[in-house]
Amino acid sequence: MKICLVATFPPSGRQLNEYAFHIARELQRHPHVELTILADELDDYGFATDANGESLKASEQPELPGFNVIRCWKFGSMTTPVRLLNTIRRLKPDVVWFNLVFSSFATPENPIAAFAGLSTPALSRACGFYTHITLHHVIESVDFAAAGVRWEKLFRMGTDVTTRALLKANSVSVLLPGYRKILVTKYAVQNVLLGRHGTFASTPCPPDFTKRGNPELRILAIGHWGTYKRLETLMEAFPAVLKAIPKAKLIVAGANHHTKAGYWESIREAQPAHLPIEFRGYVPEEDIPELFRTTSVLVLPYDSATGSSGPAHQACEYGVPIVGADIEDFRDMAADEDMSVRFYKVGDASDLANQLITVLRSPELQRSMGRQNFAAGLEMTIGNVVRNYLRWFELNRYKKALVSSPATKSSWLRSLFSGSNGIAQAGSLANDGNSGEKHGREQTGNSAQPIDFVDPLA
């Protein structure tokens, strides 16, 4: 199966590059998959800096070995659709897989280029290629005020049109049950699947709690900072945490959001020098495991959210307790994936401090939360996630073959009922690859409805 993965990809510093890396790495493990990554051109990233505040330079970021990467589109460019389509036509893949948020191709300050890029999946399908989108948020869940967007009504009109364009793809997967409900209800479509974000380890290793609290009890905040992911409340809360837990240390890692260059550096400059706060900046992928293994608690200090949390899933991978803002998306994520998360009132530094102190004071609570999160991570490894995508793609290849060549009907039916790639296993992108149990369910009140099949030929 030939797959083109359209995504930001390391060493790019742009949003979702890490997720695309883990998807690509897992796809490479499947010998029947021929993967080509259609990635963004490398640039100097003023918003992504190291611990010294130095910007990441394109010339200093070598390509990752072992991947077939074609850098054929540029962030913020109007030529993105043409360049992508020309490359796709030349490669003739079986599947074109887009890994997207609404700002994947341009910032809100450049809406025409953003819309041009986001129209590419519809154009890809129109050219006859099976096209799938993994959409990490839906615009209806975005707090535009927190994200710093002006002209909100006009922007919502534009993003409504953009969403309809995205839904012209053969299939779209979202990562929260509420997001699927929004798209199916508001836009009257049936090609939306519920998938899982996944944890990034193919073979998870149980947490080693002896690496934590020796000697520091580390609080980790990691992400792309400056819009709805903000550090002010955490900085206000930390002195109270330190007073109660003298061994506490705060680590702030990650880059600025690409629209907020210099944000975390300004936060760093405002902190008293005596506080045990370490600002690490952008963390290379190879340093992520040790960062999480030595973390006592992950904190999600957000003002709002736009989807499932990548850092929360990494915390599950390494068995780390989580303290997060009490946001509906996070509540849904924790309930749907059985995560252990202690919530604090959004913007309330005192409540945040109390929740962190409660976790850090109790080794038993840290172990209990860590083990529950690790168990949740075992249910949704990236290997299971990718296998379910591949089953879905194979199923749609069978459907296409049935229509184009009726002679294939009997062999397809034999495969269908053999169980190896059949409907029973391919029906939901959120299935657990280790069992027949289905976790991918749409929540409506207290009831759960299974995801319907999408007909890619409709």
Where are these regions (language model features)?
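Conserved donor-binding/catalytic core segment of Leloir-type glycosyltransferases
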Residues: 4-5, 211-229, 235-238, 251
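Glycosyltransferase donor-sugar binding loop
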Residues: 41-45, 249-265, 281
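Membrane-proximal helix-turn-helix segments that form the acceptor-binding/catalytic region
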Residues: 116-126, 152-171
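Donor nucleotide-sugar binding/catalytic pocket of nucleotide-sugar-dependent glycosyltransferases
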Residues: 155, 162-205
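Nucleotide-activated donor-binding/catalytic signature segment of Leloir-type glycosyltransferases, i.e.
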Residues: 264-289
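Acidic donor-binding loop of glycosyltransferase active sites
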Residues: 292-307, 320
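Conserved acidic donor-binding segment of nucleotide-sugar-dependent glycosyltransferases
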Residues: 341-349, 357-363
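A short, well-ordered alpha-helix in the C-terminal region of glycosyltransferases
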Residues: 365-379, 391
